[in-house]
Amino acid sequence: MTATLQRRASANLWERFCAWITSTENRLYIGWFGVLMIPCLLTATCVFIIAFVAAPPVDIDGIREPVSGSLFYGNNIITGAVVPTSNAIGLHFYPIWEAASVDEWLYNGGPYQLIVLHFLIGVASYMGREWELSYRLGMRPWICVAFSAPVAAATAVFLIYPIGQGSFSDGMPLGISGTFNFMLVFQAEHNILMHPFHMAGVAGVFGGALFSAMHGSLVTSSLIRETSENESLNNGYKFGQEEETYNIVAAHGYFGRLIFQYASFNNSRSLHFFLGAWPVVGIWLTAIGISTMAFNLNGFNFNQSVVDSEGRVINTWADILNRANLGIEVMHERNAHNFPLDLASNSVVPVALTAPSVEA
């Protein structure tokens, strides 16, 4: 009898815990994905802060030339970063217990791998938590679908790209100038500016910003006045009101006359779906582009593609870009390679686009 009561009490305790985890009445919804998300993001955040402030230099290239990334070792907010795991580690899973000591783990950049893996699990769980809360509230699942775009982008630069390149040292550093360095080196090695999927991503981000600004300004310009001239228009809106707060017909008419009739949406639902889908699809395509370039399926190469009738090269902007790529590749990791692969495997390229005339 006593054992039965204990089992019932423990079962009730578990049921109460489950009800609390999945309750939509909490100030912040936790959910089962939140059980995984919270410790992962807390771990990633705490280790990032500690490493950014105090981590010792990391031998990123695996050639015994440590690179300083933390504030305590001479960096500032702009130059500081969590330096990626050493090239000597490659793609090996490198938790603390795999190193001979904590000093060795820090020297080989173990914190980077710890932060990145916990962060990716955390943001993926956040996406799942969005779906879970939508499901509990009876909503459609498009919020988590939209968030899948930044999740895909983060996964591409922090996981897929290092896998394709064979080392976590090729992942994006966790800092401002480190991010810029990653972008420049990525351009030098993969010609990302000439990749169609990157172009689609640029169109998605800038187009999304443009459409957001257009939509916000149109709505703000066609608000239905519910207040006097001496009050803010915003005071005319009551949360949860059933009537429209702006005149969609006026906004539609304005924009249709500004551009042309069919450039303006007459359906608010399809308009907002478009506003959500445009940047999401663009960022999806960029993440796919990064993931393909990770395995060296690079951007288009139009170098020396225009020649005259006598076979002489007429340089285009593609050749200028190629020259910049070679220059960046020469400068980065200058002690890790004897010579950049692109330069070593091709014929000699003249430094100047045209040879200067020399007077005798």
Swiss-Prot record:
Single GO molecular function: oxidoreductase activity, acting on diphenols and related substances as donors, oxygen as acceptor
One Pfam family from the record: Photo_RC
Site (Stabilizes free radical intermediate): H190
Residues the entry annotates as binding pheophytin a: Y126
Positions annotated to bind chlorophyll a ChlzD1: H118
Membrane topology listed for this record: Multi-pass membrane protein
Binding, a quinone: H215, S264, F265
Binding site for Fe cation: H215, H272
Subcellular location as annotated: Plastid, Chloroplast thylakoid membrane
Tyrosine radical intermediate (site feature) positions: Y161
A single cellular component GO annotation: chloroplast thylakoid membrane
Binding site for [CaMn4O5] cluster: D170, E189, H332, E333, D342, A344
Cofactor note: The D1/D2 heterodimer binds P680, chlorophylls that are the primary electron donor of PSII, and subsequent electron acceptors. It shares a non-heme iron and each subunit binds pheophytin, quinone, additional chlorophylls, carotenoids and lipids. D1 provides most of the ligands for the Mn4-Ca-O5 cluster of the oxygen-evolving complex (OEC). There is also a Cl(-1) ion associated with D1 and D2, which is required for oxygen evolution. The PSII complex binds additional chlorophylls, carotenoids and specific lipids.
Processing and modification events after translation: Tyr-161 forms a radical intermediate that is referred to as redox-active TyrZ, YZ or Y-Z.
Listed HAMAP family: PSII_PsbA_D1
Protein family: Belongs to the reaction center PufL/M/PsbA/D family.
Name of the protein: Photosystem II protein D1
Organism: Cyanidioschyzon merolae (strain NIES-3377 / 10D) (Unicellular red alga)
